[in-house]
Amino acid sequence: MTASDAIRWARRVRSERPPAALDEYLAGFEAFFNDYAGRVDYWRTRNPGYHETIASLARFYVPRGARVLEVGCGTGDLLASLEPSEGVGIDLSAAMVARASERHPHLEFRHAAAERLDLAGREFDYIILSDLVGYLFDIRGALERLRAVAHPRTRIIINWYSRVWQPVVHLLEFLRLKYPLPLLNWTTVGDVENLLRLAGFETVRSRGHILLPLRLGPISRFANRFLAHLPVLRWFVWTNWVVARPIPRAAPSLPSVTIVCPCRNEKGNIEQAVRRLPALGSRTELIFVEGHSKDDTLDECRGVAAAHPELDIKVMVQSGTGKGDAVRLGFAHATGDMLMILDADLSVAPEDLPQFYDAMVSGAGEFVMGSRLVYTMDPKAMRFLNLLGNRFFGLLLSVLIGQPIKDTLCGTKVIWRLDYAHLAAGRAHFGDFDPYGDFDLIFGAAKLNLRIVEIPVRYRERTYGAPNISRFADGWLLLRMSALAAGRLFFAA
């Protein structure tokens, strides 16, 4: 069956009522792709650059060793390139499935239509739909079936041709520079996001990729990695990408919590921190991480812990320096399901922590941060230059991570321990670049495609001690960290 035959079939059956229309639609398209299976390698070798770039982008979004389902897997090459611990490919074409099984015998391939997918009892960490939505008879129905194989942390990754290039694609097919494929759905990003919502998913981030879909060495790499993300030029990318997650449901049980409290020269705040700390979840663990203080903070932490044997309090001393090192030490020894940071200066009140807990348990966020820039703060809580710097870095990081944030440097941050384990395992992607820990967590959460939300808090003037920051030196360091992250996150794929 030729592409024109398949298109005529599809247009006719789409106007009929299912299930008869769907049966005919699938039969026609399977016949077409069974025939195309014998030609696919030839046409891909004519322009390998596009498919190599798609595989590179998919590897950016999907870590090695994950459980991956690809719907519309074709010959299985993209799925194999992701190096999954468990890889399952689904395709409408029996001929494509046969070729995929022959090429990649270590992976599992099944002959099935996306609209009739049934993998009862299976769950996957990532579900890939690469260049598939253009062929689906019922996009919403296919997406709804994916809910059955998704757990709360599953990420759906969808890419498809941008509608901007529809006339060019047809021209290339007419000139026989591209094999004519029966693409019928030229959807926008808004269309796909709406269909995802209807199917029970919400978008975490969306982005365009690939300005130059050719293998032209450094020219293509420069165009696709840098130029494709610049204003105006990003309107002309070839592919749209959406990362989505299941719309969250409230946790069935109360998760336990570990609160890590880095403290350096904060002796006068330790007793208050313990006294004002609310009980959270099924169990609350408090870990003080002392940072070589000069005011007996360590002795105060130990004394307060001994005075409250009814509470689960641990005291640790960091071997390194900086808040980031203290947080990493505390998180490494935490036993709670949920990990929180509470700065020992108490400029964010311990009484605010239940708001963060509720946002996590409800599923509203997977990485929750405080924002000091919503409510009016105490007059002396933040100096003017610090306020300007915070607003600037909020805008900058919103662009870099693709999710809106206002306050990057509020010390109160919350993440699931399981997600933090993945973040720590992938820390080499950015390197050990952040002595404060804020950017390390933000960029790591963005790389994992976690839903980032902010909780407005009232920022109070500290009542003891002095700030442990230097405005100009620290601002310059934050700029350098932002530049590094831009290269490894915003311009990385």
What are these regions (language model features)?
Residues 140-152:
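A short glycine-rich, Lys/Arg-flanked "PGG" loop and its adjoining helix->strand segment in the class I
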Residues 165-185, 318-333, 350-431, 435, ...:
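Acceptor/aglycone-binding surface of glycosyltransferases and processive sugar-polymer synthases
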Residues 5-63, 217, 226-227:
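Conserved class I S-adenosyl-L-methionine
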Residues 339:
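Short aromatic/hydrophobic "clamp" motif used to bind/position activated sugar donors
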Residues 74-116:
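Class I SAM-dependent methyltransferase SAM/SAH-binding core
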Residues 2, 8-10, 224-257, 268, ...:
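Hydrophobic helical membrane-anchoring modules
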Residues 290-299:
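A conserved acidic beta->alpha catalytic loop
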Residues 110, 298-333:
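Conserved donor nucleotide-binding strand/loop of the catalytic core
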